[in-house]
Amino acid sequence: MDSTPNAEPTSALPPKTRARINRLVNALLERYQVTEPPVPIERMLKQPLDGLWEAHPSQISFIMGHGIYRYAPRLAEARLLYRMLSDSPTAREGGLDTPWPVSRRAIKYFARCLLIPEEWIRALRPPDRTPDAVSEIFQVTTYDAIIRLAELGLPMPADVVIPSDE
């Protein structure tokens, strides 16, 4: 693993879009009083605060992942939450500003930001900032942990190549 962080966080998303998504994430974490990992995404979907969106049980998957994909459903639930927020006039009126329309890339970025908040990952001890450790601590796939580390300009394994569509 390369021990030197990148000079700048990397993302293909425009800075304004990233900033809006980060403000949205911080507002959600504050409203749900979530202060440590793992983010309770299933509870957030099932229990919308102040009626900001409608919880549709038919849209929420209760399938458990397994093996290397055991945390993939959490990312899917976070992406669903973004879509529900973006479709909700009440959420917009309540100050939860979701950029819309956005690319699939932006929705994936939201999911990673929500499940792996920047402040939390930066607060980890350096030995806990490995893809495998981040995966376990935040309950996300190792793949998404790698992408998030790269987005934040944190040390990455030297042999990791991140697809350009992320």
Language-model region placement:
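Active-site hotspot residues in diverse enzymes, especially metal/ion-binding acidic/histidine motifs
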Residues: M1-E166
